[in-house]
């Protein structure tokens, strides 16, 4: 399971890049409510805190809180590592943005609860697989599409979806490695994998683009 998108901070682009590099496929997605807490060593007060450590996504999701508190953010690999680094530190002016479970695991105090900027803070996680697996009920598909670097080429791709009445629920660009200021496009589309429209799309999309990579069809588990 890997985080691919957050309702506050947007896409986790590094995960998409890793999927492309290692040829993984999405087989399921699910949404999880995410709460962040300010953790520090026992006996530390909020007023003592100057520096806060966490994953980049957690820092982005708590950006307003960090600014209001006048804290200096530091990015680490994940929220659990942030909690451990605070627990292992000799300093009493550092804190972590992490879970209450990590507070218990590493013997930290919860100075403030639920400090994310939005109460409705959800992260979408993808279950990925090296071999391609499509399970019954799959009604969403992720694609990576590269178009020629000239006017109208992206429009031709979008026209394919429009002509087949396939809803695009997400569209984002990412730089193409080794090609300055050229971009690939990630699409999430809403269409049952068994629908004739989907089969037509996959059979003809290559006519409108330079490259189309199929990242998987899946359903979202709520």
Language-model-detected regions and their locations in the chain:
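Domain-level signature for soluble enzymes in the chorismate/prephenate branch of the shikimate pathway
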Residues: 1-222
């Amino acid at each position: 399971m890997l985080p691919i998108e957050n309702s506050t901070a947007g896409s986790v682009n590094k995960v998409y890049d890793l999927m492309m590099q290692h040829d993984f496929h999405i087989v399921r997605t699910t949404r999880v409510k995410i709460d962040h807490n300010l953790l520090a060593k026992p006996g530390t007060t909020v007023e003592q805190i100057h520096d806060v450590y966490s994953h980049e996504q957690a820092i982005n999701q708590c950006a307003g809180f960090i600014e209001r508190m006048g804290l200096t953010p530091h990015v680490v690999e994940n929220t659990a590592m942030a909690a451990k680094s605070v627990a292992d530190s000799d300093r009493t002016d550092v804190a972590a943005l992490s879970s209450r479970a990590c507070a218990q695991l590493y013997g930290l105090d919860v100075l403030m609860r639920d400090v994310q900027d939005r109460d409705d803070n959800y992260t979408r996680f993808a279950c990925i697989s090296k071999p391609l697996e499509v399970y019954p009920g799959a009604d969403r598909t992720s694609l990576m599409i590269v178009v020629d670097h000239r006017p109208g080429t992206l429009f031709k791709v979008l026209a394919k979806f429009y002509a087949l009445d396939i809803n695009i629920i997400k569209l984002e660009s990412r730089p193409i490695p080794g090609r300055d200021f050229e971009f690939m496009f990630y699409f999430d589309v809403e269409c049952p994998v068994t629908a004739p429209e989907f089969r037509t799309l996959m059979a003809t999309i290559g006519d409108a683009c330079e490259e189309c990579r199929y990242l998987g069809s899946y359903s979202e588990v709520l």
